[in-house]
């Protein structure tokens, strides 16, 4: 599976709204889906699954990264990629490199 940059950005934006702005995860995901009606079933599944998992593993992932909590978009993307690595999801190796190209 490839991580496409727009999906990684969507995950990072959802995390920012959850942790920086204090919104509930389900409402953030619902708003993201309403704002992006062109996302398909797989895109929606990817975003929802991974946002919930990263919320669940939030503190552990920051320990793995060995960094203080930082809510910048770049740091949240890095956190998401750390989650993909730790969870050992089947991803293409180049997906990590491509995901950081803006």
Residues covered by each model-derived region:
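Class I Rossmann-like S-adenosyl-L-methionine
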Residues: 1-102
